[in-house]
A protein has these predicted regions:
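Rossmann-fold NAD(P)-binding glycine/threonine-rich loop
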Residues: 108-124, 131-152, 157-159
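Short, ordered loop/turn segments at secondary-structure junctions
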Residues: 51, 93, 109-110, 132-136, ...
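Rossmann-like NAD(P)H-binding beta-loop-alpha module
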Residues: 147-220
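C-terminal catalytic/substrate-binding lobe primarily of soluble NAD(P)-dependent oxidoreductases
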Residues: 2-11, 201-446, 451
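Structural detector of well-ordered beta-strand residues that form the stable sheet scaffold
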Residues: 89, 129-130, 155, 180, ...
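Short acidic, glycine/serine/threonine-rich loops at helix termini
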Residues: 60-61, 140-143, 166-169, 184, ...
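N-terminal glycine-/serine-/threonine-rich beta1-alpha1-beta2 phosphate-ribose binding loop
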Residues: 1-120
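Short gly/pro/ser/thr-enriched loop/turn and capping motifs at secondary-structure boundaries
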Residues: 54-55, 135-140, 144, 161-165, ...
Length: 452
């Protein structure tokens, strides 16, 4: 990215590379480590934590780094990083607490675990870059409150769809246009996919079958569009957005899928389609100046009133270092929520579910996520897809039925549940989730400031 590349080169010349501490060493963490190691001057992957330490060791060696050392104490950790060793932390909080780390990157995909890591990083003055759309979509707005409280930044990443879309939105606004539709493009949508159906694909690319399932069943794209909605104030037309509407026409004609008056009335929408080919994300925008509309037509953008802008790819870990540099060097947040949540992700039954069943996590066998406007989510007390794991059903649920908090017994003592309750209370003065936690789990979970 222009400006970022020169700033990173300057850090390299000064011998002061950005020291990255990464939590999570899966497929994306592996790619990010390799990218930083070989293609990003002025930055180094100083430390990695993974629940299975051998996986953290692997991502270093995958990247050609052999000077790998384990660190069990803060003193061991800090010394190893100072010495320039490829450091594997036995505890993620060693990364968060170290004065030798400049920024924490969360690549876990976990809401509960991610929340603990993020808040610990904040306590020690560390900015956090998220490659964890799930935590951002579920409790991102309240985590931003804590980031501001501690004077740090919590940012989405470049390369992944939310960051890619917000970069495009900022660019389009810079041209003087008004974004109206921000769209994400998929190649497949089937809410009933599961790790069994996706196993072969996952093995082919060396990915986790549950994560691949979350791509196919619509959960991941719902998390992503929720982040974009919260960063722009845009809504969804209805729960589930366009639910896999297939479009194989030209990107120049995709505006025909949308009624401009309806979209204006909503203040803009986030959406997704299956297709068209050659497009990964798009933004439809209008221009208020008829003189400029004349020029846009001349420049082959069509007659309007909605003009298409798009990016044909998303390169995830190739571009993620740009976000790290933007945050550390410029204090530039990639996709911060404007304020409270605007769109959230509710849990929907993937099959008929029996009373007493325990739900598995997103991307598995029991549920899928759909984007829904916060007013509906709050009023109907839907269960968020990011927090389904470990919930026990109190009644039978039919396939395609939205799950609510009243339908489940929550796992006890989760930080993320307290943060959800605080998020509703802070932004909408709604206390029903506080009351629900008090009724079902006792006073310890009531109105507790999660990071006080």
């Amino acid at each position: 990215m222009i400006i970022v590349d020169n700033a990173l080169k300057a850090r390299e010349q000064q011998g002061k590379p950005i020291r990255v501490g990464m939590v999570g060493a899966g497929f994306m963490g592996q790619g990010l480590t390799n990218q930083i190691t070989h293609s990003v001057p002025g930055m180094r992957m100083a430390a990695v934590y993974n629940r299975r330490p051998e996986r953290a060791q692997h991502v270093y060696r995958y990247s050609g780094l052999e000077n790998v050392t384990m660190a069990a104490t803060q003193a061991q950790f800090d010394q190893a990083v100072r010495q320039g060793l490829s450091t594997v932390a036995e505890d993620p909080f060693l990364i968060c607490r170290s004065g030798e780390i400049d920024v924490v990157v969360d690549v876990t995909g976990s809401v509960e675990f991610g929340a603990h890591v993020i808040l610990e990083a904040f306590k020690h003055g560390k900015p956090v870059v998220l490659m964890n759309a799930e935590v951002d979509a579920t409790i991102g707005p309240i985590l931003q409150v804590y980031a501001r409280k501690h004077g740090v930044i919590l940012s989405a990443c470049d390369g992944d769809e939310p960051g890619l879309q917000m970069n495009l939105v900022r660019w389009v606004k810079g041209l003087g246009l008004i974004p109206r539709v921000i769209g994400n493009v998929k190649g497949l949508q089937d809410p009933y996919r599961n790790p069994t159906t996706q196993q072969a694909w996952a093995e082919r690319w060396g990915q986790n079958a549950a994560m691949v399932t979350s791509f196919a069943d619509g959960s991941k794209i719902s998390f992503e569009q929720s982040i974009v909605a919260n960063a722009t104030g845009f809504k969804v037309r209805s729960r589930g957005m366009s639910r896999g509407m297939k479009y194989d026409g030209s990107i120049m004609d995709i505006h025909k899928l949308y009624d401009l008056d309806e979209i204006r009335a909503l203040g803009g929408i986030v959406d997704y389609t299956v297709g068209p080919a050659g497009v990964k994300i798009f933004c439809l925008a209008e221009h208020p100046d008829p003189k400029q509309r004349h020029y846009l037509n001349l420049y082959k953008m069509g007659e309007g009133p909605l003009y298409p802008f798009w990016v044909p790819y998303h390169l995830v870990h190739f571009e993620a270092p740009n976000a790290i540099a933007r945050v550390v060097l410029f204090g530039d947040n990639v996709a911060p929520p404007l304020e409270g949540p605007v769109v959230e992700v509710c849990a929907v039954a993937k099959r008929d579910l029996a009373v007493g069943e325990t739900l598995d996590e997103y991307g598995m066998y029991t549920s899928y996520g759909e984007a829904v406007n916060t007013e509906e989510m709050n009023t109907r007390r839907y269960l968020p897809e990011g927090l389904v794991d470990g919930c026990k059903l109190k009644r039978a649920i039919a396939k395609n039925e939205v799950l609510t908090y009243d339908d489940v017994e929550l796992p006890s003592g989760r930080l993320a549940d307290r943060l959800r309750a605080e998020q509703y209370r802070h932004f909408s003065n709604a206390t029903w989730l506080d009351e629900h936690l008090q009724r079902t789990q006792g006073a310890a979970n009531v109105r507790s400031e999660a990071c006080a």
